[in-house]
Amino acid sequence: MLALTRRRGEEIVIIDKETGEEMVIAVLRQMQHETRIGIEASPRFEIFRREVLERKRATDPA
């Protein structure tokens, strides 16, 4: 189960409550007085996201 999103320096991180695993989902970039957010689209994040969704479906009596 995803717990919370928090900011760690210039990174935005999600944390899996069950495993404590942290995953960077965005990186803040300062560009000419503007802050840009770049989303991480790494295969590792996609695998993590799928695993979390599968666990949620398995435990959610919907």
Regions found by a protein language model. Name each.
Residues 1-62:
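Compact, glycine-rich, soluble single-domain proteins
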